[in-house]
Structures are given as structure tokens and as C-alpha cells.
């Protein structure tokens, strides 16, 4: 049985004062009056990415404190643990910290992630942050997932109807260009008449992480300002117990198990240290890491900040006590732990049936053989930032664009989601594997750029941040494109000796390059490609990848020597 708080509501600010006034006048029982605090268990998971089945590869395990690895994850086990953890508490609330779908497993993505929304509905999620991946297919598709309705092209592929999410999807810093909120910034739940608020934020640079065209008319504002503003609003209306779902995370200096805290730096940590002291608990996401920390808020009071890996491998749990008089969280009584979603308890049969149904429907397509490999194609990066998988994908896109005059191709590493591993004695790979490696379904475009523009694009692989650090995103080049990179040089002057098919690129020359639509729209900060001169479509990235593998089967992993590192 799914357990929820006595009342769940998602109300805009205009209706909040009346709702709170009603809740405050509710009488307490004698037993409640004797207990000065009410206990509430807050549960959260993050970055599920449509993982209805236990995830493959490195995402299938969790590292324990003793260094051992245990199998973990899978929607049916996640639901079973959530039920177990909720059953241990009189009152509980269940949150997701975003990236519920997008870059999803085949069994979810084949059906436009409708099975994942059904899963979340059945699990009794009370509220979810919006992650950047919820906007992979644009705001219009996000709204369909939120409110329901069949896909405008494919219809309802996982049933006759699609009802959408029955829980609020939140982002306090996503607005329309005119400043109006594009979704709810918060929601309020009630436990024995006491309001518990939850705020959510998404990355301020979301527009660079998704196809810009899909989020046209939206802006993503500063996270800290949005948190503080919304916390003040909730406090004004008498909501004193507040959780934050922050779709931003950190990379711990070391991984010493689910409940370690090797978090020493990073934007998410800085935000957690600076966020309004009115916020009592912070759940984070996006970095797919595990940690359980207590950090001081701006008033010096301890505050939980934690994350639970990804793909349903961990449930983050915080037990809080709320003072009935002040309606605020008693911080010194809070306790937190990350519960690993192991496979040594019975899975939830209802959710297992849902996962099995989706997997069975997708399996016939996913099992089709595409090609064979003589060695694995992985995302492991060399010193130059190249990988064997990235280079093959770039070669595939060059081949797809060659009919439109493409002389080279570049692809972003963020579009490579899984390694392509050979199976069986002949090294076979399936459509399901290629889909997992290239799941976004981006269209390909062939553009005309000048030599100067090409150099600018390559220089944009090194992007300065406001905190003085540099974000490095090395694009995978096709075999026809070579250049030298010097990381010790000044930003903007790190790329030299660019050659196409061995010929030196000249600034005033014109060249045809194949890129996916994400890059053509300026995604990941590659504004240079937005010129779109003489742009033509060249099919879909996944189709190009599977066709290239089939044509060149058996495929041998290429050398990673297209970028020369100097300095």
C-alpha cells in the first residue's frame, strides 16, 4: 500500500493563505496536544532516467563503505523499498529530485516515457523537481507529460490514453520571458494540519543543456535567488518546515559509501551553504553521486544535504520532527541515511508487472542484430578527450552527411549515454544497445562554416565559468578532422593546426560540417554553430549510427589520435 500524508495539495501563492488559515484552525486530538512535535519521514530519489528494469553496466551497482559492490536499482525494487520505508513511519512524503525521464532506458523511451510516469504515479510521488532532461524534447512535450494526452505524432503507444503525472512538477527558477512562472515553484503538503513546503530548482544553464529551440520563450534564472525568494514567500504564509529539491549536485573527492561526505567544493555545495536558512533539508541530483552531508546554513545551523546515486539505486531518507507550536523543523533531532535499493527483498509485484510489460513490448525491436564489433566501443576518454565510441559516432554522422557535402563531423560527448559492448563469440550488438548509446533521437544537420567559425567552435570546448573555473567539453571529431590542442594556453587560443582531410584550414575558407541539432542550436554553449548557413537535414543520429555500424561490420575500435595534445 502506498502511504501518503493526510492531505496533499499543490497550490499557487494566491490560494496558499486561505489553505493555511483553514489548516491552522483544525483542532488537535488530546494525544497530539501532548506530543509537542510531529515526526515526518522525507524520502527522495533522483535521476531515475526511465530505468524500469535494473540498470546495466556500472549503474547496476552501489559501492559500500567497505569498498564492496552490491547490485542495486530497478523500479520494482525501488518501489518495494519505498513501501518498506514509508511503512516504518506514521507520516511520510516522497519526492523525486528530477530527471525522471530523458536519456531513458529503451523500455521507457520507446513509449515516450509514458511507462515511467505511470510508475511514478503508482509509487505515490508527492512532488518532483524538474530536471534538465525533462525538457529534452522541449517544453510542449514536458507539458504533455505533466497534464496528459497522446503524443501528437505517435499517439498513445503504451495504452489507449495517457493521463500524465498526478503529482506536481516544480521549478522555482523556470519562467517565461515575461517573468511569469512556467510551472509551480513549490507545493505544500499537510501533516496533522502542519504545512510542509517543498521548493525545487533546476540548473540555471538548462538552456545550454537541451535543444534551445525546444525551450524558446523560457528563461532559467539564478537558483539561489529563486530559493531565497520562494522560501520567504512560504515563510510569509506560515510555512516553516521547508525542503529543497535542487537539481544540481557535486562530485565528491572520494566515494566511501552511500553515507560518506567527501564533498569539499562545487556550485551545489556553495548553493547549499548560502541558501536561505528557512530551508531545512536539501536533496540534490544531476551528478549521479552518493553522499550524506550536514552543512551549516547561513545562520550556522546544521542542515542535511544529500544525494542518492541514480537510476533508482538509492532512496535518501531524512527523519524530521516539527514543532507543533512554531511549525518549524527541530534541526538537532533530524537524522538522515541513504538506503541502498538491493535485490534481497521481494520486488513490488505491481511495478514489476508494469516493467515486464514495457520490456516485453520493446524487446522485439531492441533484440534486432545491428552489427558485430571486434572490440568494445567505450566512452572512456584519453588524454585528448577522445573516446572510441565518440569517434565512431562522429564517423557515422560524417558518412550520413556526406551526400550533402559534409567534409567532417563533430558530436558532443553528452549525447553518448552507454558503452557499446560486444556480445557473444561474434561480438554482436543489438538495436537496443545502439539506442542506449544514442537515445536522444537528434536530427543531423550539415552546415557551411568558415575556417574562422570552425576554430571558434573548437575554442568553445573550453568555457570559463563565473567562479573562475573552466568547463571542458571535447567534441568527438570524425577521422577527416585533426587539430592540436594546448590546455595550458590562454582560453580562446588553445586550438591550432586544424586540418580537414590533411589540408590546412584557412580562416576565410568555407567547409561543410555535420552536427546534431543540439549543437546546431548552440547547445552546450557552442554558439558558433548557430550560423546555420546552407543548412540541410541529414536524417537522425541513431539511424546514422546503426546504418554505419551495419555497413562497416565488423567494426574495429578506431584509434584516438585525431586530436594532438601539446603542452
Residue map of PLM features:
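N-terminal secretory signal peptides that target proteins for export/translocation
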Residues: 1-7
